[in-house]
Every structure is written in structure tokens, then in C-alpha cells.
From Swiss-Prot:
Protein's recorded name: Rho-related BTB domain-containing protein 1
Pfam family membership, one: BTB
Species the sequence originates in: Mus musculus (Mouse)
GO biological processes: small GTPase-mediated signal transduction
Primary gene name: Rhobtb1
Gene3D superfamilies noted in UniProt: P-loop containing nucleotide triphosphate hydrolases (3.40.50.300), Potassium Channel Kv1.1, Chain A (3.30.710.10)
UniProt keywords, alphabetically: GTP-binding, Nucleotide-binding, Repeat
Similarity remark: Belongs to the small GTPase superfamily. Rho family.
Entry GO MF terms: GTP binding; GTPase activity
Ligand binding (GTP): 21-28, 84-88, 140-143
Residue stretches making up the BTB domain: 266-426, 484-551
Domain of life: Eukaryota
Tissue specificity of this protein: Highest expression in heart and testis.
Chain spans, region Disordered: 325-351
């Protein structure tokens, strides 16, 4: 149907609505939202403003726009024609104002100047060109009143004037101007699709009432109401912040390989057939290989008190359990003279001369014969050695290897045990496979076979299974204290740990044990203000890079300890766990308000910023209930937190004021309508004279 036919249809009122206002206040988007049902994302709304005008000929060329222009307001069929205009003050809008039925005057609630121009420029211009045309004042961009202005300013074009908190106009500012001009006032948000129908339906009512005064014979206009009140907009609750856990740092694979090259805190020395020495660490070897686990476990059971008697000869006994056959060699009664163990509190300056170290090596006992237990080993004994990195003396387990164990493949084997990785370009794969067979490392042997068969892609699953077994063995060693070389004394007990694993997992521990601190030489380290349960959880995380699932302790205690050790990833994991537990309790109907209040400032103090943000969100979105139960606690919070509460509380203060004003004005209008209806009923009775015959 052609648009001209709307003018000819009986009882259809065609309304020409002109939309005016400053540039960039949202006139065109408001028109498009009504005429085309356009919805925009916040990114589109914040895009660079390009002055545009919505073309009036859309009603002629677009059937959908024409259909949407038709509506029924107060039982009156209407056809709404929207006229867009440029916001430049110097433009001539005389043609647009011609024969207009209503003018919608727009300003932005984020631009105080646009509201000032309503009084100083726009209203005067409207009354100059169409003095009898009704006007409706509209505050656009309502969503900016509750938006995150920092995010909004970041999303806008670089040279745009930033929107400040003081620029946002409260509803009463627009209402005061509307009252001064004697016109109705409404607010809209294209982003939230709020107020669009209110604005144009009430603009239509204003136009129809004005027309009714001139065309009083049109009976269908008698039911038209005066512009209605607009209920205030309740902004949606802000979504809770998502706890983001950063990418897990590497599980120490590269650091472990580096530790093999720079054997800090080494407690194993392999002696090859050509007297080449390779330092290593029991905990890495034992947790990666069952063969080495049996070897070092046998050593621990043979000499459980090695730390206190470095110079004593250790008698041999038959090892029963996991080993199959172990021959024991009796030592001579006149044992070799050994250098006593250094004082644990000695400083790093107490170094042993290299000649003395060589003398200890030359005079070392053959110890336990291992040739009958494994083809790869000859003997094992203990000595006090000088660490090549720290230059400090300490006990080491000296393992002499069989001449068949070549240096190159053995170093590759050790690197695999430390990192779980095998270089496909390794030269002596055959020698490595034979060595893996001798030491019963079947996963390494399979990986070598896959590489030789051009099927290296199959090694991924083997590597994954290797790391799972290693993690389980590490957790077992942590819980039992097996192969430990340091003990942490805490407020409520002690816990054993392993320096090599700590050095590779935590920079704080690496600085303490790898530097010149006295703790690097001590087997016992005192950590004040730490309980055993929290330290156990931190150590388990450092060993496995996972948070213990059976976490039965105060999250803030663990966060405080993780922050003390500079473990940001662990802090994020505990934050996520704490939020999950709080959310679960809230869903089950348990009040978490008091717990959240107690978490807030402690989380801020210990740099748990994500947990603090979640607590702030919970308090703000439940502000009324929290404040009613914990008013003193709310008032005791820091000034910054209280300012945040006031700014982000839900419902916001401006909404509560608007709701109160709306209810008050609504009651007043209902009283006026009731009085008006009584007045009309009295007038009807005054002109009604019933005759006795009719009665």
C-alpha cells in the first residue's frame, strides 16, 4: 500500500513528529529504533559519530518502515511520520518544522551543554517556527548513567572528549528544565531498548490532544489521555566478575633441565668408567624411575641417620622388599678418613679446597656392591662432597656406573628423567634404547623405538602418562617425607620438603636456597606465622601445579601464604575456589554476607584483587540487605571501599529517588483524575432532567 493512502484512510490520524537536538545526542538512533526496530551493541553506540539524517522517504520505499509507522494509541489509529534533523545550530530547519504536529527535543544525559542548549537555543527556535506545536523533552543515552565510564572512554575514538562522572546528569536536572518549560519529560536508552515506546506514544498523545482542540467534532479523539508518567528505569544488575586463572607456569621442565646442568643442592654423584662426574638429585630420579626409586629407597633404609654421622662407616645388610638380589661387601675395619660434615649454619665462605675434595674421592670406599642387583651399577656409597655451584660441603650418594654406561646416552637419559622430554634428533638412539632396557625404563625405550620407526607422534601419550606417574610419586614423597633434604618448622609442627623441587617451582624458594642466605646451608628452616595445613597445600601446589581438591582451610590464609611466596597463579586458583564455595553456599540458601565482608579487605591486603572485586560486587548488588544486617561493619570499611559502595550500589541512589518521585506524582495524578471524574459526573446530572413519565 502506498504511504499516501494513510492520509486518505478514515479515522487514521497521521502525525508528523520532528526530532531536534544537538549533534551526537542520539536523535537518529532513537528514530531508527522506533521506525526500523534497530538494536545496537555498545561497541556500535560508542563508534565514531558521523552526522547523519534518517531519510523521510523511507516510508515510501520500505514497506516494513511503513507498517511499523502504524499504531493504535488510546483507541486511535495513527500513522507516525518521523522527521530527522541535523544538530548544527546554523542549519535552517524551517522546512522540517512546517506543519509539524509534535516536536521531540533531545539532549544527552552525558552532555550538560546539550541540556543548556535546550533552553537557550532549541526551545526558542521551536516556538519561533511553530508556536502552537506541543514539545516533548527527551534525555537520551540513559545507559551511560550506570555504565563503566572507564571502559566507555577506552572504547571511544582516541581524540574524543572523555566522559567524566560529573558530566552524567541526574534525572531531576532534566525534569527541572521540563517543568520550567511546561513540557513532559522522558528518558530513553537505545542500548537497553528502554523508553522508546514511552517517548513516541506520549508524543502522539500530545499531538492528538492539540488536534482535538482544533477538530473538536472528531469523537474518536475524546478518549486520548494526556501524556502519561514514565516509570523510572531500573538498571540491570552488573554481572559478577569472572575469576580468570592465568596460564599455568611450566611445571619446572625447563628449570629442571637447567638444574641438571647447574646442580645446585645436588645429593647424587654418578661416576662413569672414565672418572667423569655427573651431579644429580635423588628426588628427580626417584620420582621418574622405579629403578632409581628402589636404589635410593634402599639407601635410606640402610642409613636412616646419614645427616648426623657423615664420618661413620655404614654396615651393609641384605635389602629385602622391592629389590631382587643385592650382594653386600664387607668394608675393612680401617675405613678411610673422611672430612666431617660442615656446620649447617656455616657461611658460604667456608669452602673446601679442590685438592681435599679429590683426596676424599680417591680414598672413598667401594660401599655397596650393586653389580648383582643391576647391570648398570657397580657400587654405591656416601661421601661428603663440595657442591660445584654453591661451593659448600654436603653429603652425597656416590653411584659408580658400569663401563657399558656411556656418557652421552646417560646424560640424555638423565635429561629425560628431569624433563620428560626426548629430542627426536638425538644421535645415539640405539645406545639410549639399550641403556633404558638395562635400567628398566620401558617408557623411554618405547619412545626411542617410536622415533626410530618414524612414529614419534605416538610419544605424546607416553609423555603424558610419564608426567602423571611422576606427579603421583612426588605427592607420595611429599606426604611421607621420602628423600627430603629440608624441614620447615612452622607454628604448629614441621613438614619435610625437597630443595630441588622448590628451587624449580618457586622464585622465592630459589632465592632462599640458591643464594647466599644462611637457609641455603641449613637442613631446618623456620617459617614464622605459617600453619602446617597451609604450607602443605602450598608445597603440593609447587610440586604438582594443582590446587589440592580436599582443601579444608581458610582461603585467606592460603592466599596470604601464596602472596608471601609470590605465587600469583596459586592466588588465582584459591580465589576461584573461594568464589565457587561462596556461590555454592548462596545457591543453597546460606547467607554469605558476613563472610564476604570479612574477606574484602583481607583480600585487598594480600593482592587477591579478583576475589576483592567479587566481594565488592556481591556487597553492592545486595547492598540493602547487607547494610541492614551489618551496618557497623560497612561503616568500618576504608573510605575508598565506602565510596565504591555508594557509586556502584544496586539499586542506585538516583533510581530510589526517581521511584519515590514517580510514586508520589502518580498518587497526585490519581487524585486529580478522581476529582475530575467527580466534576464531570456532577455536570452530567446538572443537565439531566428526568420526567415523571420516564421515571
Amino acid at each position: 500500500m502506498d504511504s499516501d493512502m494513510d492520509y486518505e484512510r478514515p479515522n487514521v490520524e497521521t502525525i508528523k513528529c520532528v526530532v531536534v537536538g544537538d549533534n551526537a545526542v542520539g536523535k537518529t538512533r532513537l528514530i531508527c529504533a522506533r521506525a526500523c526496530n534497530t538494536t545496537l551493541t555498545q561497541y556500535q553506540l560508542l563508534a565514531t559519530h558521523v552526522p547523519t539524517v534518517w531519510a523521510i522517504d523511507q516510508y515510501r520505499v520500505c514497506q516494513e518502515v511503513l507498517e511499523r509507522s502504524r499504531d493504535v494509541v488510546d483507541e486511535v489509529s495513527i500513522s507516525l511520520r518521523l522527521w530527522d534533523t541535523f544538530g548544527d545550530h546554523h542549519k535552517d530547519r524551517r522546512f522540517a518544522y512546517g506543519r509539524s504536529d509534535v516536536v521531540v527535543l533531545c539532549f544527552s544525559i552525558a552532555n550538560p551543554n546539550s541540556l543548556n542548549h535546550v533552553k537557550t537555543m532549541w526551545y526558542q527556535e521551536i516556538k519561533h517556527f511553530c508556536p502552537r506545536t506541543p514539545v516533548v523533552l527527551v534525555g537520551c543515552q540513559l545507559d551511560l548513567r550506570y555504565a563503566d565510564l572507564e571502559a566507555v572512554n577506552r572504547a571511544r575514538r582516541p581524540l574524543a572528549r572523555p566522559i567524566k562522572r560529573g558530566d552524567i546528569l541526574p534525572p531531576e536536572k532534566g525534569r527541572e528544565v521540563a517543568k520550567e518549560l511546561g513540557i513532559p519529560y522522558y528518558e530513553t536508552s537505545v542500548f537497553d531498548q528502554f523508553g522508546i515506546k514511552d517517548v513516541f506514544d506520549n508524543a502522539i498523545r500530545a499531538a492528538l490532544i492539540s488536534r482535538r482542540h482544533l477538530q473538536f467534532w472528531k469523537s474518536h479523539l475524546k478518549k486520548v489521555q494526556k501524556p502519561l508518567l514514565q516509570a523510572p528505569f531500573l538498571p540491570p544488575k552488573a554481572p559478577p566478575p569472572v575469576i580468570k586463572v592465568p596460564e599455568c607456569p611450566s611445571a619446572g621442565t625447563s628449570d629442571a633441565a637447567c638444574l641438571l646442568d647447574n646442580p645446585l643442592c645436588a645429593d647424587v654423584l654418578f661416576v662413569l668408567h672414565d672418572e667423569e662426574h655427573i651431579f644429580a638429585h635423588r628426588i628427580y630420579l626417584a620420582t621418574s624411575s622405579s629403578k632409581f626409586y628402589d636404589l635410593f629407597l634402599m639407601e635410606c633404609e640402610e642409613s636412616p641417620c646419614w645427616g648426623g654421622g657423615a664420618g661413620e662407616e655404614v654396615p651393609c645388610r641384605d635389602f629385602q622388599g622391592r629389590t631382587q638380589s643385592l650382594g653386600s661387601a664387607e668394608e675393612g675395619k680401617e675405613g678411610p678418613q673422611r672430612t666431617p660434615q660442615a656446620d649447617p649454619g656455616a657461611s658460604s665462605g667456608q669452602d673446601l679446597p679442590e685438592s681435599l675434595a679429590l683426596q676424599m674421592e680417591a680414598s672413598g670406599s667401594e660401599g655397596h656392591a650393586l653389580s648383582g642387583w643391576s647391570k648398570g651399577f657397580v657400587s654405591m656409597h656416601r661421601e661428603v662432597r663440595v657442591n660445584p655451584i654453591s661451593k659448600r660441603v654436603g653429603p652425597v650418594t656416590v653411584v659408580r656406573l658400569d663401563p657399558s654406561m656411556q656418557s652421552g646416552p646417560f646424560r640424555t637419559l638423565l635429561r629425560f628423567l628431569y624433563s620428560g622430554q626426548l629430542d627426536e634428533k638425538e644421535k645415539d638412539l640405539l645406545g639410549l634404547a639399550q641403556m633404558a632396557e638395562v635400567l628398566e625404563m620401558f617408557d623411554l625405550r618405547m619412545m626411542v623405538e617410536n622415533i626410530m620407526n618414524k612414529e614419534a607422534f605416538m610419544n605424546q601419550e607416553i609423555t603424558k602418562a610419564f608426567h602423571v606417574r611422576k606427579a603421583n610419586r612426588i605427592k607420595e614423597c611429599l606426604s611421607k617425607g621420602t628423600f627430603s633434604d629440608v624441614t620447615f618448622t612452622l607454628d604448629d609442627g614441621a613438614i619435610s620438603a625437597h630443595k630441588p623441587l622448590l628451587i624449580c617451582s618457586c622464585e622465592w624458594m630459589a632465592a632462599m636456597f640458591g643464594g647466599s642466605f644462611v637457609e641455603s646451608a641449613n637442613r631446618e628452616v623456620h617459617l614464622p606465622n605459617i600453619n602446617k595445613m597451609s604450607m602443605q597445600a602450598v608445597l603440593e601446589y609447587l610440586y604438582t601445579k594443582q590446587l589440592s581438591p580436599n582443601l579444608d582451610l581458610d582461603p585467606l590464609e592460603l592466599i596470604a601464604l601464596a602472596n608471601r611466596f609470590c605465587l600469583t597463579h596459586l592466588v588465582a586458583l584459591v580465589e576461584q575456589h573461594a568464589v565457587q564455595e561462596l556461590t555454592k553456599a548462596a545457591v543453597s540458601g546460606v547467607s554469605i554476607d558476613g563472610e564476604v565482608l570479612s574477606y574484602l579487605e583481607l583480600a585487598q591486603f594480600h593482592n587477591a584483587n579478583q576475589l576483592a572485586a567479587w566481594c565488592l560486587h556481591h556487597i553492592c548488588t545486595n547492598y540493602n540487605s547487607v547494610c541492614s544486617k551489618f551496618r557497623k561493619e560497612i561503616k568500618s570499611k576504608s573510605a575508598d571501599n565506602q565510596e565504591y559502595f555508594e557509586r556502584h550500589r544496586w539499586p542506585p541512589v538516583w533510581y530510589l529517588k526517581e521511584e519515590d518521585h514517580y510514586q508520589r506524582v502518580k498518587r497526585e495524578r490519581e487524585k486529580e483524575d478522581l476529582a475530575l471524574n467527580k466534576h464531570h459526573s456532577r455536570r452530567k446530572w446538572c443537565f439531566w432532567h428526568s420526567s415523571p413519565a420516564v421515571a
